[in-house]
Amino acid sequence: MNESLFTPFITPTVLGLPAAVLVILFPPLLIPTSKHLINNRLIIIQQWLIRLILKQMMTTHNAKGRTWSLMLTSLIIFIASTNLLGLLPYSFTPTTQLSMNLAMAIPLWASTVAMGLRFKAKITLTHLLPQGTPTPLIPMLIIIETVSLFIQPLALAVRLTANITAGHLLMHLIGSSALAMLAINLPLTLITLTILTLLTILETAIALIQAYVFTLLVSLYLHDNS
């Protein structure tokens, strides 16, 4: 049976429930925990990663911005874990769904804007009008800056969706080509499998980079409004 190219991005269900819930909640249960060794290798690596994330994200923030430390750390770990799990065979990647990415981007963006309007409304509103703007251009620039402000969460979600989806589609195409050529040309199949392996390594890096970019942009929005 021939499948559509976008079949892997259809949300699967198990007993009528979205399988994305299992993908998100089940993997943490597989991580071994030690009741006797507090500072084992896994804990040390986790602490090192958290310190690295906080150093990269929160250095330029003030006291109000640093209250978001736990949120941003959890966000980057969640997106990175979801992207990496989606690279496993016969798995589903929730971040290929624009609806899910919008559900993450819009509340975070709205929270940063609300924070700016609450604590420094004048400075936040002055961002809508660049300093030194000629008087005839003021109405048009206010409209342009307002539209660009409301496009920010859409850009966040579309960027993550497009990058993850494009990589999965390319892997699907190359994998299908390798399978089709298996009985036709073995040397060419080996070359294709080598390309697929390299692409998988690249997609692993992209999965981590996109999680970092998404969280970094949220951090920048927070910095502008805190």
From Swiss-Prot:
Gene Ontology terms, cellular component aspect?
A: mitochondrial inner membrane; proton-transporting ATP synthase complex
Transmembrane feature ranges: 12-32, 68-88, 97-117, 138-158, 182-202, 203-223
Q: Which Pfam families match?
A: ATP-synt_A
The chemistry this enzyme catalyses reads: H(+)(in) = H(+)(out)
Query: By its UniProt entry, which Gene3D superfamilies does this protein fall under?
Result: ATP synthase, F0 complex, subunit A
- What processes in GO biological process is this protein linked to? proton motive force-driven ATP synthesis; proton motive force-driven mitochondrial ATP synthesis; proton transmembrane transport
Task: Sum up the protein's function in the record's words.
Answer: Subunit a, of the mitochondrial membrane ATP synthase complex (F(1)F(0) ATP synthase or Complex V) that produces ATP from ADP in the presence of a proton gradient across the membrane which is generated by electron transport complexes of the respiratory chain. ATP synthase complex consist of a soluble F(1) head domain - the catalytic core - and a membrane F(1) domain - the membrane proton channel. These two domains are linked by a central stalk rotating inside the F(1) region and a stationary peripheral stalk.
Q: Name where it's found.
A: Mitochondrion inner membrane
Q: Which gene encodes it?
A: MT-ATP6
Instruction: List the taxonomic lineage.
Output: Eukaryota, Metazoa, Chordata, Craniata, Vertebrata
Write down what this protein is called.
Answer: ATP synthase F(0) complex subunit a
The record's keywords, sorted A to Z, are: ATP synthesis, CF(0), Hydrogen ion transport, Ion transport, Membrane, Mitochondrion, Mitochondrion inner membrane, Transmembrane, Transmembrane helix, Transport
Q: Which family does it belong to?
A: Belongs to the ATPase A chain family.
